[in-house]
Amino acid sequence: RVLFPCFFGSALKMDGIDEFVAGFERYVREPEYDSEFGARIYKVSHDVQGNRLTWLKVTGGEFKAKTMLSGTARVGADLGESKIDDDGMWHEKADQVRVYSGAKFTTVDSVVAGTVCAVTGLTRTFPGAGLGKEPDGVNPVLQPVLTYTLLPGECDIHACLVALRELEDEDPLLHVVWQPHLEEVHLQLMGAVQLEVIQQMMHDRFGLDVSFGPGGILYKETIAHPVEG
């Protein structure tokens, strides 16, 4: 970039709006897209019916509903019944293609390059993943450093695990680990603030009032012999 435009005005008073629109039209270039299909996933969420939504931007070609897609399986993810080949790739069919406007959406048959949409029917996608010609993005620089034990109280621990798996699906910085021999759920995350957010979301979205044990350091390596640091 060699030009950084600066505009002054007020939308409330309709002051400077015409100049802004004219400058926007003059200086902004319309992207040029390839004919080969590509898309970048930037978010995963769930609608009020519990349908899993994969949010993506089409970066090339055309994307149609019912298209068979392939992608790299997320490291450490529970693959369930998804079909995974020898190269660690999943294969699933996209169901609905939705174009949202606020909370409302329109179901469409296809979208072209440059369109942002939400797709149902995909269960193994994750934020940052690429589809088609798009490569996967780099892993987040920040990684969970603390581990906490879930204290379900009077809540069913398996219901808590299902809810936490859904939150893990949406947040790349949350890792949920089920310890079957202990019948415990462990959370790997960034710290107390993220823990408070998760606790509130468990209450608001799932009606589960839970707490957590004291945090511990998540060690990435095991010391093989005594050393001096």
How would you name each of these model-derived features?
Residues R1-G229:
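Structural and coupling elements of P-loop NTPases
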